[in-house]
Amino acid sequence: MYDNLKSLGITNPEEIDRYSLRQEANNDILKIYFQKDRGEFFAKSVKFKYPRQRKTVVADGIGQGYKEVQEISPNLRYVIDELDQICQRDRTEVDLKRKILDDLRHLESVVANKINEIEADLEKLTRK
């Protein structure tokens, strides 16, 4: 699992916290940040440089002219897919926790309202 990350020398992909991707000239710069250890001010990170792939494509759709375009490297695309799996998993866990807490707060308010309603009904019965 995570063969592309391991080929970059990342032996513990589960310690990845986040990543950033930017373009500089004809290169894409990938920076991977790892979870901070206690007492560290900055997260450990590693940087990788990927040359952009150049392609010549039809410019006007009729075949009259051509233009050169640059695309992200296929290898980088595979690495980003793996990074997205890792980073999305963490976000999904946080979102699930937030949903459970929201459901719990909603349940508390529903129960509190029902208790007030039942107490009001009891109060009506005791007045008669």
Curated annotation (Swiss-Prot):
Pfam families: DUF3461. It comes from the Bacteria. NCBIfam families: PRK13677.1. Belongs to the UPF0325 family. This is UPF0325 protein CKO_03204. It comes from Citrobacter koseri (strain ATCC BAA-895 / CDC 4225-83 / SGSC4696).
